[in-house]
Amino acid sequence: MQQLNKTLIRQRFGRQLHGYNRHAFIQKKMAGHLADMVSASLASSEVGRLFEIGVGSAALTDALLHRLRIDRYYANDLVPQCRQMVETVTALHGVDSAEFLDGDIEALREIPGDLDVIVSGATVQWLEDLPGFFHRMAGALKPGGVLAFSTFGHDNMQEIRALESVGLHYHTLAEMQAMAGELYEVTGMEEERHQLDFTGPEAVLRHISRTGVNGLDGRAWTKSRHRAFIDRYRRAFSSGDGVRLTYHTMYCCFRKCPASAGVEATCC
C-alpha cells in the first residue's frame, strides 16, 4: 500500500487547487451529500461553532452554508492557499466570524473546542491514526455534538490499484464504527460506488492529476512505463467506446455520547 507523504500531498493539492472544482465532480457530489446528512442530523439549522477539517477548495463549506446558518466557522487544511478559498466563500454567505488553521490536523497542538459540529470531506483517508483522531474530536465536541465525514472505500480507483499495486488502505464502515467505539453513537452510515467513463486511459490520468493527489506513487513515469500502463488499462477496463474508473464513496455521521463528556482535547 502507498505510504503517506504529507509534503507531497500538500504540494500536489496546492498545484491543482484553483482548478480543482472543475474536475473533482465526484468530490463535489460528496460535499452535497455530506452536507445533507449533517443538516438532517441537527435539530435546527442554526449552528454556533463548526470546525471543518480538510477544507480544500471550500466546496463542502459552500454546501454547508447553503443549508445552515453558522455563527463561528473554523476551517483547517494542510495547504495554506486554502485560506483564501474558505475566506471568500464564508464572506459570500455573510459569516460574521471565520478562522483558518493552517497545518496537518494530526500535528496541530491546539484545535477549537466547545464545538457543535465537526465535518471533514474526503480527508480522513489521509490520516495515520484514525482512532486517535476520533478520540481527539470527541474532546473538542460538546455532548451531543456531531462528527460527520466522507471518505473512500476499498474499491476506490480499483483499476489503478490492479495495474500498479499501489493505493491507500481504506477502512470499512464497520471498522470505522468500531474505532469510534463508545465515544459516539451512529446516526448515519452510507456507501456508494460510481463508475466514470473516459475516452481513454490518457483521460483517466489527466483526471487523477487534476484532482490533486492521485492513487499512484512518486516513481518517474518513463515513456515505456506510460505506454505499458495505457495498453494494459485499455485491455483490462474498456467500457463502451472508452474506459472506466471506479469511485467508492463512504459517509459517516456520529453523535458524541453524553458518557464521553469527560474526554479531553487540547483546544484553543
UniProtKB/Swiss-Prot annotation:
Top EC class for this record: transferase
Source taxon at top rank: Bacteria
Molecular function in Gene Ontology: carboxyl-O-methyltransferase activity; malonyl-CoA methyltransferase activity; S-adenosylmethionine-dependent methyltransferase activity
Disulfide-bonded cysteines: none
EC number(s) given by UniProt: 2.1.1.197
The UniProt record lists the keyword Transferase: yes
Pathway: Cofactor biosynthesis; biotin biosynthesis
Keyword entries, A-Z: Biotin biosynthesis, Methyltransferase, S-adenosyl-L-methionine, Transferase
Catalytic activity: malonyl-[ACP] + S-adenosyl-L-methionine = malonyl-[ACP] methyl ester + S-adenosyl-L-homocysteine
Family: Belongs to the methyltransferase superfamily.
Functional description taken from the UniProt entry: Converts the free carboxyl group of a malonyl-thioester to its methyl ester by transfer of a methyl group from S-adenosyl-L-methionine (SAM). It allows to synthesize pimeloyl-ACP via the fatty acid synthetic pathway.
Official protein name in the record: Malonyl-[acyl-carrier protein] O-methyltransferase
Native organism: Prosthecochloris aestuarii (strain DSM 271 / SK 413)
